Protein backbone atom coordinates (compact mmCIF):
# COMPACT_ATOMS: atom_id res chain seq x y z
CA UNK A 1 0.00 0.00 0.00
CA UNK A 2 1.47 3.37 -0.99
CA UNK A 3 1.95 6.20 1.51
CA UNK A 4 -0.37 8.43 -0.53
CA UNK A 5 -3.12 5.79 -0.37
CA UNK A 6 -2.63 5.43 3.40
CA UNK A 7 -2.81 9.20 3.84
CA UNK A 8 -5.85 9.43 1.58
CA UNK A 9 -7.76 6.70 3.40
CA UNK A 10 -6.87 8.22 6.78
CA UNK A 11 -8.07 11.60 5.56
CA UNK A 12 -11.46 10.08 4.63
CA UNK A 13 -11.70 8.33 8.02
CA UNK A 14 -10.90 11.51 9.94
CA UNK A 15 -13.57 13.30 7.92
CA UNK A 16 -16.02 10.53 8.84
CA UNK A 17 -15.54 11.51 12.50
CA UNK A 18 -16.11 15.18 11.73
CA UNK A 19 -12.49 16.32 11.82
CA UNK A 20 -12.07 19.42 9.70
CA UNK A 21 -9.31 21.86 8.89
CA UNK A 22 -7.69 23.38 12.01
CA UNK A 23 -9.29 20.86 14.38
CA UNK A 24 -7.01 18.92 16.71
CA UNK A 25 -6.37 15.20 17.01
CA UNK A 26 -4.09 13.92 19.79
CA UNK A 27 -1.76 10.93 19.62
CA UNK A 28 -0.64 9.36 22.92
CA UNK A 29 1.88 6.69 22.03
CA UNK A 30 5.47 5.62 21.73
CA UNK A 31 6.93 5.86 18.21
CA UNK A 32 5.28 3.26 15.99
CA UNK A 33 3.92 2.98 12.42
CA UNK A 34 0.34 3.68 13.52
CA UNK A 35 1.48 7.01 15.00
CA UNK A 36 2.80 8.13 11.62
CA UNK A 37 -0.23 6.82 9.72
CA UNK A 38 -2.62 8.69 12.02
CA UNK A 39 -0.48 11.84 11.75
CA UNK A 40 -0.46 11.73 7.93
CA UNK A 41 -4.26 11.45 7.83
CA UNK A 42 -4.78 14.33 10.26
CA UNK A 43 -2.43 16.61 8.34
CA UNK A 44 -3.88 15.60 4.95
CA UNK A 45 -7.29 16.86 6.02
CA UNK A 46 -5.74 20.07 7.36
CA UNK A 47 -6.18 19.05 10.98
CA UNK A 48 -3.59 19.65 13.66
CA UNK A 49 -1.75 16.76 15.31
CA UNK A 50 -1.14 17.07 19.05
CA UNK A 51 1.56 14.77 20.40
CA UNK A 52 1.36 13.56 24.00
CA UNK A 53 4.27 12.01 25.84
CA UNK A 54 3.59 8.36 26.80
CA UNK A 55 4.84 9.25 30.29
CA UNK A 56 2.23 11.98 30.85
CA UNK A 57 0.17 11.20 33.98
CA UNK A 58 -3.64 11.48 33.82
CA UNK A 59 -3.72 15.09 35.11
CA UNK A 60 -1.41 16.21 32.28
CA UNK A 61 -3.35 14.16 29.73
CA UNK A 62 -6.49 16.01 30.86
CA UNK A 63 -4.75 19.38 30.61
CA UNK A 64 -3.30 18.69 27.16
CA UNK A 65 -6.52 17.28 25.70
CA UNK A 66 -8.54 20.18 27.15
CA UNK A 67 -6.08 22.94 26.25
CA UNK A 68 -5.69 21.67 22.69
CA UNK A 69 -9.43 20.99 22.35
CA UNK A 70 -8.64 17.62 20.75
CA UNK A 71 -11.65 15.82 19.29
CA UNK A 72 -10.06 12.40 18.79
CA UNK A 73 -7.32 10.63 20.72
CA UNK A 74 -5.22 7.86 19.21
CA UNK A 75 -3.91 5.86 22.18
CA UNK A 76 -1.26 3.19 22.06
CA UNK A 77 -2.51 0.68 24.60
CA UNK A 78 -4.40 -0.02 27.82
CA UNK A 79 -2.09 2.25 29.85
CA UNK A 80 -2.84 5.28 27.67
CA UNK A 81 -6.55 4.43 27.33
CA UNK A 82 -6.84 4.16 31.13
CA UNK A 83 -5.38 7.66 31.51
CA UNK A 84 -7.86 9.08 29.03
CA UNK A 85 -10.85 7.28 30.55
CA UNK A 86 -9.87 8.52 34.01
CA UNK A 87 -10.24 12.14 32.88
CA UNK A 88 -12.92 11.68 30.21
CA UNK A 89 -15.58 13.65 32.09
CA UNK A 90 -13.23 16.64 32.20
CA UNK A 91 -12.56 16.58 28.44
CA UNK A 92 -15.94 17.33 26.81
CA UNK A 93 -14.51 17.87 23.30
CA UNK A 94 -13.12 14.33 23.09
CA UNK A 95 -15.54 12.27 21.00
CA UNK A 96 -13.49 9.14 20.26
CA UNK A 97 -10.51 7.18 21.65
CA UNK A 98 -8.98 4.90 19.03
CA UNK A 99 -6.47 2.42 20.45
CA UNK A 100 -3.68 0.62 18.60
CA UNK A 101 -3.21 -2.44 20.87
CA UNK A 102 -6.18 -4.51 22.05
CA UNK A 103 -4.45 -6.39 24.88
CA UNK A 104 -6.27 -5.79 28.16
CA UNK A 105 -9.11 -3.80 26.59
CA UNK A 106 -11.48 -6.60 25.56
CA UNK A 107 -13.97 -5.99 28.36
CA UNK A 108 -13.88 -2.22 28.29
CA UNK A 109 -17.30 -0.81 27.57
CA UNK A 110 -17.44 2.77 26.38
CA UNK A 111 -19.08 4.11 23.26
CA UNK A 112 -16.07 6.41 22.86
CA UNK A 113 -13.64 3.50 22.43
CA UNK A 114 -12.73 2.02 19.05
CA UNK A 115 -10.10 -0.50 17.99
CA UNK A 116 -7.50 0.58 15.42
CA UNK A 117 -8.48 -2.24 13.03
CA UNK A 118 -12.14 -1.20 13.31
CA UNK A 119 -11.12 2.37 12.51
CA UNK A 120 -9.18 1.15 9.46
CA UNK A 121 -12.27 -0.60 8.08
CA UNK A 122 -14.23 2.65 8.11
CA UNK A 123 -14.08 4.59 4.94
CA UNK A 124 -12.92 1.98 2.43
CA UNK A 125 -16.10 2.46 0.43
CA UNK A 126 -16.12 6.17 1.21
CA UNK A 127 -12.59 6.46 -0.17
CA UNK A 128 -13.66 4.90 -3.47
CA UNK A 129 -16.57 7.36 -3.71
CA UNK A 130 -14.66 10.43 -2.55
CA UNK A 131 -11.11 10.27 -3.93
CA UNK A 132 -11.37 13.91 -5.04
CA UNK A 133 -12.16 14.96 -1.48
CA UNK A 134 -8.59 14.21 -0.42
CA UNK A 135 -7.10 16.35 -3.19
CA UNK A 136 -9.53 19.14 -2.29
CA UNK A 137 -8.40 19.02 1.36
CA UNK A 138 -4.72 19.03 0.46
CA UNK A 139 -5.20 21.89 -2.01
CA UNK A 140 -6.82 23.97 0.76
CA UNK A 141 -3.78 23.69 3.07
CA UNK A 142 -1.50 26.73 3.12
CA UNK A 143 2.14 26.69 4.20
CA UNK A 144 1.34 28.97 7.15
CA UNK A 145 -1.43 26.66 8.45
CA UNK A 146 -0.58 24.91 11.72
CA UNK A 147 0.29 21.22 11.26
CA UNK A 148 1.52 20.20 14.71
CA UNK A 149 1.18 21.31 18.31
CA UNK A 150 4.10 20.12 20.39
CA UNK A 151 3.84 20.71 24.13
CA UNK A 152 6.78 21.47 26.39
CA UNK A 153 7.33 19.16 29.35
CA UNK A 154 6.00 21.81 31.72
CA UNK A 155 8.90 21.77 34.19
CA UNK A 156 8.54 25.49 35.03
CA UNK A 157 4.74 25.67 34.87
CA UNK A 158 1.90 24.32 32.74
CA UNK A 159 3.03 22.84 29.41
CA UNK A 160 3.06 25.36 26.58
CA UNK A 161 2.19 24.57 22.98
CA UNK A 162 4.70 25.20 20.22
CA UNK A 163 2.97 25.35 16.85
CA UNK A 164 4.69 24.17 13.69
CA UNK A 165 3.26 25.04 10.29
CA UNK A 166 3.09 22.93 7.16
CA UNK A 167 5.82 25.22 5.81
CA UNK A 168 8.02 24.39 8.81
CA UNK A 169 7.46 20.71 8.14
CA UNK A 170 8.24 21.06 4.42
CA UNK A 171 11.59 22.71 5.20
CA UNK A 172 12.39 19.94 7.69
CA UNK A 173 11.56 17.24 5.14
CA UNK A 174 13.72 18.96 2.53
CA UNK A 175 16.69 18.91 4.89
CA UNK A 176 16.23 15.20 5.52
CA UNK A 177 17.22 14.58 1.90
CA UNK A 178 20.52 16.45 2.18
CA UNK A 179 23.77 14.55 2.72
CA UNK A 180 24.92 14.95 6.32
CA UNK A 181 28.07 16.73 5.14
CA UNK A 182 25.87 19.72 4.15
CA UNK A 183 24.76 20.55 7.69
Specify the residue positions occupied by each region the protein language model found.
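Conserved AMP-binding/adenylate-forming
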Residues: 13-59
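Tryptophan-centric aromatic hotspots in well-structured domains and transmembrane helices
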Residues: 3, 35-36, 53, 63, ...
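Conserved pre-ATP/AMP-binding loop-to-beta segment of ANL
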Residues: 114-117, 124-151, 158, 181
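Structural core segment of the AMP-binding/adenylate-forming
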Residues: 17, 44-122, 136
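AMP-binding/adenylate-forming
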Residues: 47-50, 65-77, 147-150, 158-176, ...
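Single conserved hydrophobic/aromatic residue that forms the stacking wall/gate
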Residues: 1-7, 12, 175-183
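Short aromatic/basic micro-patch
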Residues: 4-5, 74, 113, 140, ...
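Domain-wide signal for the mature, well-folded portions of proteins, strongly enriched
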Residues: 27, 46, 94, 99, ...
Amino acid sequence: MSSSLVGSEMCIRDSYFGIQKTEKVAIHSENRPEWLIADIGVQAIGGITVGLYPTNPPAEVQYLLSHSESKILFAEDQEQVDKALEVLDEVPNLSKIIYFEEKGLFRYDSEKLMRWDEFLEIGKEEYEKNKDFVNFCIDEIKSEDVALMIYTSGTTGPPKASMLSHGNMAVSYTHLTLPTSQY
